[in-house]
Amino acid sequence: MGLREFAGLKRDDQRLDPFALARFAKLLVATFAEIEPYLTPETRAHLIGDGKDKWSGGAASQTLPDGRKLIILNPTHGKNRQNATLMEEICHVFLGHKPSRLAIKKRGKNGETIARDYNEAIEEEAYSTGAAALAPYTALLRMVNDGKTSQEIARHFDVSRALVEYRIKVSRLWDAYKEKVFQGD
């Protein structure tokens, strides 16, 4: 069963709400305001200040007593970006991925902390699976053939234009998209 069917969606053009799906993946999505009291002022300032472009979201490595995992999303990102980030975290669960560890591994040559046990293959698998669930191929194909722009498609699915363009490209619809959208130029 696919993620969209699991979420109860009947049509390929229905919007998938990752926040509603998160509970089925045993994820507790906490708002930044809910965790803020537990952060030092320096950590808070970094996460929503200088470091805001260095993270999208994350899951706690330890499960909560009720079996759920805690997810925090970057509050400086818009809803469409948070949808993609949360969907990626959901896909990690459904795909059975081992969580990345968040620990200081080493310091870079400029003194910056390199702090994640990052597995590019599983991150790409989770992102691409989540993106496909958010913007499914059959609906994407129809919208591309109808001459919809990536911005219009993004608004329809409540995702970013970058995610839609990624899906169009990996679905090998880019040439058709350019032909339809830019035919008047």
Regions found by a protein language model. Give the residues of each.
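Active-site hotspot residues in diverse enzymes, especially metal/ion-binding acidic/histidine motifs
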Residues: 1-185
